[in-house]
UniProtKB/Swiss-Prot annotation:
Gene this chain is encoded by: yfeW
EC top class, as a word: hydrolase
GO biological process entries: proteolysis
Catalyzed reaction equations: Preferential cleavage: (Ac)2-L-Lys-D-Ala-|-D-Ala. Also transpeptidation of peptidyl-alanyl moieties that are N-acyl substituents of D-alanine
Keywords, comma-separated and alphabetical: Carboxypeptidase, Cell inner membrane, Cell membrane, Hydrolase, Membrane, Protease, Transmembrane, Transmembrane helix
Alphabetized InterPro entries for the sequence: Beta-lactam-related, Beta-lactam/transpept-like, Diverse_Enzym_Activities, Pept_S12_YfeW/YbbE-like
Protein topology in the membrane: Single-pass membrane protein
Subcellular location: Cell inner membrane
The protein's name in its UniProt record: Putative D-alanyl-D-alanine carboxypeptidase
GO molecular function: serine-type D-Ala-D-Ala carboxypeptidase activity
């Protein structure tokens, strides 16, 4: 009995001695990690000029060599109620939570998949039909091949699906109309392919809606519960959630988005469309109406510090502190460039050619990867310079420039701040 106890203690000590302890973020001055502070702080005036010109808000955080060297907020979390400018707008702070839009794809769906791949619970070469029953071609489909689609095809955005079927808008979706999650899965199965799988890359929300359903099939848990309990909670993240208003957060903690719901200032209409200023609800139509606020392609809210931790996980090769989610081989697998298009990894966008300059600028390394979000969010992770940048914004919280010409262009979207690459270059240009 005594021998068993001693052996157990020795084994425990031995395992703990070899346990991986990953770097955690600490704060440092820019000069301590190779920045010219004066150059870096020139951003302050430029961003403030953009706020004065009408850009709603920008939250910026910069990581270098495991240190947070810049974290600041500019502008307003909420400045409009409908078309009316508030007499007392709510200032954005470094704790303000933002609708991540398509960055959800990376920091919910991809993180979940990377974890499941590392644990051996899924292989990217598995067929989609292994996890979604009856995922196959429909009678009358002109382009065939759904039953042969693999998860890697979905991740590479080469599966053949359209970019945006607009399931909740009956006027556009037609027979594919859906405003309930269970129906949406059936409509996705019925969605016809638009091109022969593997013939080209078309960035598609449908791809990540499918991946969200696959994660739920494997884990037997809703996507939000899985990522919140197995990823965010172990990492100590307290402001990264789906449906924040249902989970203890209040509107003043969150940046508002579109002024008149999803109507683009009154030119778009469909059943149950929201018309009030969106504040604490996901902006994305498919995520809100068709998926109940939780989807693999959109719906996640977070702040810059929580996203910084997740970016540091990637820089660390899969862990943070004493938490290991996956390993460096998994990171390499998911961020490796697609042979067909160097700007795509497995979900991640990669700085593979000049077409990514508006996103990553001209100074980031070619190995840089990350993603953008329609609401005004960017994440950029540079393993060569051991550096990461997160920009969170609420770009749609401004009037539509010309609703009848293009309802998807907001006044703020015409400002230079809407081009992330310029900000990224100013940060890199501040390195000594």
């Amino acid at each position: 009995m005594k021998f068993t106890l001693v052996a157990t203690v020795l084994l425990t000590f031995s395992l703990s001695a070899f346990a991986v302890e990953y770097p955690v973020l600490t704060t440092a001055s820019p000069d301590q990690v190779g920045f010219d502070s004066q150059k870096l702080h020139r951003l302050d005036g430029w961003i403030q000029n953009q706020i004065d010109a009408g850009y709603p808000s920008i939250n910026l955080l910069v990581i270098k060599d495991n240190h947070i060297v810049l974290q600041k907020a500019w502008g307003y979390a909420k400045k409009y109620d409908g078309s009316t400018l508030l007499a007392h707008p709510i200032l954005a702070t470094t704790n303000t939570m933002y609708d991540l839009a398509s960055n959800t794809k990376m920091y919910a769906t991809n993180f979940a998949l990377q974890k499941l791949v590392y644990e051996g619970k899924i292989d990217v070469n598995d067929l989609v039909s292994k996890y979604i029953p009856d995922f196959k071609d429909m009678p009358g489909d002109k382009i065939k091949g759904k039953d042969k689609l693999r998860i890697i095809d979905i991740l590479h955005h080469v599966a053949g699906f359209p970019a945006d079927p607009q399931y909740p808008n009956k006027n556009v979706a037609g027979k594919l109309f859906s405003q309930s999650k269970s129906t949406t899965l059936e409509m996705i199965k019925k969605t016809p392919l638009e091109y022969q799988p593997g013939s080209k890359h078309i960035y598609s929300d449908v791809d990540y809606m499918i991946l969200g359903f696959i994660i739920e099939s494997i884990t037997a848990m809703p996507l939000d519960r899985y990522v919140e309990t197995t990823i965010y909670k172990p990492l100590g993240l307290k402001h990264t959630v789906f449906n924040p208003l249902m989970k203890g957060f209040t509107p003043p903690q969150i940046a508002a988005t579109e002024l008149h719901g999803n109507t683009r200032d009154g030119v778009i209409h469909f059943p149950n469309i929201r018309t009030n200023t969106l504040w604490g609800q996901v902006h994305d139509e498919k995520a809100w109406y068709s998926m109940g606020g939780v989807s693999g392609h959109a719906g996640l809210f977070s702040d810059t510090h929580d996203i910084a931790v997740l970016m540091q996980v990637m820089l660390n090769g899969g862990g943070y502190g004493n938490v290991k989610l996956f390993d460096d081989k998994t990171v390499a697998q998911f961020t490796r460039r697609s042979p067909e298009d160097a700007t795509f990894g497995l979900g991640w966008r990669v700085n593979g050619n000049a077409s990514m300059t508006p996103t990553f600028g001209v100074l980031a390394s070619p190995q840089t990867y990350g993603h953008t979000g329609w609401t005004g969010t960017l994440t950029s992770i540079d393993p060569v310079n051991h550096m990461a940048i997160v920009i969170l914004g609420n770009r749609p919280h401004s009037p539509v420039a010309n609703p009848k010409v293009n309802p998807n262009v907001f006044v703020s979207g015409l400002l230079p701040a809407a081009t992330y690459g310029w900000i990224v270059d100013q940060i890199y240009g501040s390195l000594k």
